[in-house]
UniProtKB/Swiss-Prot annotation:
Residues 404-483 form the B5 domain. Tetramer of two alpha and two beta subunits. It is an enzyme of class 6 (ligase). One of its GO terms (cellular component) is phenylalanine-tRNA ligase complex. The keyword Transferase does not apply. Its main location: cytoplasm. This is Phenylalanine--tRNA ligase beta subunit. It comes from Chlamydia trachomatis serovar D (strain ATCC VR-885 / DSM 19411 / UW-3/Cx). Its cofactor is Mg(2+). One of its GO terms (molecular function) is phenylalanine-tRNA ligase activity. Residues 39-154 form the tRNA-binding domain. Residues 694-790 form the FDX-ACB domain.
Length: 790
């Protein structure tokens, strides 16, 4: 965004130096730099006002001028014919170096001219390197009467010395008014609205239109203005638009562009001859339709696009560009001027679809001030009246509701302390936020804040903390060394090192999946599509890893042992969620050529890796339970879900053969995917717990129990461990047997119970009694949840 200093200064109660403006932009978060660089010698060319001008006593063509340069008066002998009292001109102070028409450099010095001392030189624009601004063949350049004195003349003549880059959250700064308002909050000046934007309220009428889309366009204003002509704009308006980076077209269009760039609210003028019944409204297309816009390009507007229309015709793409058929031409004498508030999400949707970027779309997609629509319309009408005194203005037509309910948020001192490590009282919070234009009220241990209508970037308490941060000098902020790593980052480093040391290679795959990769999932409908493209956001690490594994195997890799840590995305209750996960994928056995023969990968291979991962994460395996799973990407009988109480940690198992065939992998593939956030929440804060090695022997007893085939074998083990016993040290599953008869509804589970006392050796009788007690409790427990027989 180009920002002419001469125009920006009009919005301040008193002028600011370039350094002050740049410092304020830096605190706002705007990257600003001078787009024109001048030699240091030209910095001594400043603006000065001629207080008096009298003829030189010894020369007819010379004038003795007394000039005030912002600091003091000085006498300058000038030969320009337009040298007169009251004008503001460029003054080259002694030491300035100017280049003449032949290219030679002249150093300005104090000198006597016909017996009188001259302490500088009054310059023309061509002598400073701006010949295109010189209006007369001979003469000094004249600045507007409101130009501040003592400022760099070259910076003012350059037109756009500042080039500002706005981040998406600073849409309210995309105008001279918005930028000046933010600078005034952080500078010793107040905001000043120039007289050219002053206005008197005009009559207003409310209209009802059944076709108007009030959801996408809460309020829509239009006004008919007649008695106009599309002549060229005055020179000052053309110069201002050029400095702002816009090409002047005609008086009507130039006014709408100038008001938009100055005040931030886009406007559009329609030739009333193209508008049926002289009435406009905003409507949503029910089906795709073609439309030729002002750039003479024809676009197919998708269904759902918001358009500006009359009773039968589309006259413009709302918030982006008007149609060619309704544009103002040299024959236009009557216009309908439109100003509206279009919802950012509505404009953003179709603007990206047709890939058309305009100044209006830039502002609407970031959010304009809903309470500034009518004042800006009044300002534009005022400027039109100043250029066309005989213009007739009809009453303003309003469709929709212009009422506004400000967002109310609370900010607490403890939140500021937690995020910024700064102690602030409620009174200090009120002072800081009030200085930024927020309405505040003190509550119990908090400050209630009303967000201004133009601040679309303020949505929650942390946004207010950011505002407080930028008003706090660095010297007041605590200087402390931040933690080296966040807990989640530390966990990722630990898991990466562990898995890499275990022989696994790390994969890095894209979060966006194309059509080919996204098809490597039997649950494709759950992927989140990216608007206007065939790409989709992944909801699992599986598709990308499976594609990479297939690529490696097709290139004769003997095996694939890989892992990946990355983000996945999902949509729950109309809200998008982002989660970090760790995944392991194994295909083919590393030791296929061993003398022991081939040992194929199985469900238990990946189960072992999951258990290792849990141990490495610092979580206790006993805190988890395995439950049946029916995920379509896995083999229906070789998968399991891992739960911690009611929280799903992840799913693992053998991939579905159909999915392996889609990936053109001939071997079995086992896969596991776990949530890092759940792992982190279960990590033991105290670290590993060490116990002394037992000095007394342990004794074991085996038990085989028949249970329902649908009951998990691990359920029996957990039930045994849940019984209170001072001697039962551990329980392991030895085997699970199910007969070949498909009609059998039971299976045998063999377990080994280990008993030990850490203070003495247990007798055989004590072990037998404890064993009998536990098996009796187990039979009773299993009777309630399924058939059990030990």
């Amino acid at each position: 965004m180009l920002v002419p200093l001469s125009l920006l200064q009009k919005f301040f109660s008193s002028p600011l130096s370039i350094e002050e403006i740049l410092q304020a932009c830096d605190r706002i978060g705007i990257e600003a730099e001078c787009s024109n660089v001048f030699p240091d010698s030209l910095n001594t060319v400043v603006t000065g006002k001629i207080l008096s001008a009298s003829p030189h006593p010894d020369a007819e063509r010379l004038t003795v001028a007394i000039v005030f340069d912002g600091k003091g008066e000085r006498q300058i002998i000038c030969g320009a014919p337009n040298c007169r009292a009251g004008i503001i001109v460029p003054i080259a102070l002694p030491g300035a170096k100017l280049r003449n028409a032949s290219g030679e450099i002249t150093t300005i010095k104090k000198a006597k001219i016909r017996g009188l001392e001259s302490q500088g030189m009054c310059c023309g624009a061509d002598e400073l390197g701006f010949p295109h601004l010189q209006k007369a063949e001979r003469g000094i350049f004249e600045f507007p009467a409101d130009t501040p004195l003592g400022e760099s003349a070259c910076m003012l003549l350059a037109g756009a010395p500042l080039e500002c880059s706005l981040t998406p959250n600073l849409g309210h700064c995309a105008s001279l008014l918005g930028l000046a308002r933010e600078i005034s909050f952080l500078s010793p000046v107040s905001l000043n609205i120039p007289e050219e934007f002053s206005f008197a309220s005009l009559p207003q009428e409310t209209s009802i239109c059944d076709m108007h889309d009030a959801g996408a366009c809460p309020v829509f204003y239009s006004v008919k203005i007649s008695g106009l002509s599309c002549r060229r704009s005055p020179e000052y308006l053309q110069a201002a638009l050029t400095a702002l980076g816009q090409k002047p077209l005609n008086a009507i269009v130039d006014i709408t562009n100038y008001v938009m760039l100055s005040l931030g609210q886009p406007l559009h003028a329609y030739d009333s001859q193209a508008v049926e019944q002289k009435s406009l409204h905003a409507a949503t297309l029910q089906s795709a339709q073609p439309l030729t816009l002002l750039n003479q390009e024809t676009y197919t507007l998708p269904a759902g696009s918001l358009v500006v229309a009359d009773q039968h015709n589309i006259l413009g793409l709302a918030g982006v560009m008007g149609s060619a058929a309704s544009s103002c031409s040299e024959n236009t004498t009557e216009i309908i001027l439109e100003a509206a508030y279009f919802q950012p999400q509505a404009v953003r949707k179709y603007q990206r679809t047709i890939q058309l970027h305009t100044e209006a779309a830039y502002r609407f997609t970031r959010g304009v001030d809903p309470q500034g629509v009518l004042p800006v319309l009044h300002a534009a009408i005022h400027m039109i009246q100043s250029l066309f005194p005989d213009a007739q203005i009809s009453p303003i037509q309003k469709i929709g509701d212009d009422s506004f309910s400000p967002l109310s948020l609370s900010v607490r001192p403890k939140t500021i302390k937690r995020l910024l490590d700064i102690e602030l009282s409620t009174a200090e919070i009120v002072a800081k936020l009030s200085s930024l234009g927020f309405q505040t009220a003190v509550e119990e241990q908090a400050v209630r804040v009303e967000v201004p209508s133009y601040r679309h970037d303020i949505q929650e308490e942390t946004d207010l903390v950011e505002e407080i941060c930028r008003t706090t000098p660095f010297v007041q902020k605590t200087q402390k060394i931040l933690p080296t790593y966040t807990p989640i980052y530390s966990l990722k480093r630990e898991l990466t090192a562990f898995l890499a040391n275990g022989g696994l290679q790390q994969f890095f795959t894209y979060s966006l999946l194309d059509t080919e990769v996204s098809s490597l999932s039997l649950q494709e409908s759950s992927l989140i599509p990216v608007q206007n493209s065939s790409w989709k956001l992944r909801d699992s690490l599986l598709p990308g890893m499976l594609k990479s594994a297939a690529t490696n195997l097709h290139r004769q890799a003997p095996y694939v042992y890989a892992f990946e840590i990355g983000n996945v995305y999902s949509k729950e209750q109309n809200r998008y969620q982002e989660e970090e996960r760790v995944a392991i994928l194994l295909s083919r056995q590393v030791m296929d050529d061993s003398w022991q023969g081939k040992t194929p990968l199985s469900f238990y291979t990946i189960k072992g890796w999951v258990e290792k991962l849990l141990c490495q994460s610092g979580a206790s395996i006993e805190d988890f339970s395995l439950q049946p799973s029916q995920h379509p990407n896995f083999h229906p009988y070789q998968q399991a879900a891992l739960y911690q109480k009611k929280h799903l940690l992840g799913i693992f198992g053998t991939l579905h053969p159909q999915l392996c065939r889609k990936a053109q992998i001939k071997h079995d593939v086992v896969f596991a995917e776990l949530s890092l956030n759940v792992l982190l929440s279960l990590k033991k804060k105290s670290g590993p717990h060490y116990v002394p090695y037992p000095i007394y022997p342990a004794s074991s007893r085996d038990i085989t129990i028949t249970i329902d085939r649908d009951l998990p074998a691990d359920l029996v083990r957990r039930e045994l461990l849940s019984f209170e016993s001072k001697w039962l040290e551990s329980v392991h599953i030895v085997s699970v047997y199910q007969g070949r008869d498909s009609a059998s509804q039971s299976k045998n589970v063999s377990l080994r119970m280990v008993f030990r006392d850490h203070e003495r050796t247990l007798s055989g009788q004590e072990i037998e009694e404890e064993y009998e007690r536990l098996t009796a409790l187990l039979d009773k427990k299993l009777a309630n949840i399924g058939q059990g027989n030990s």
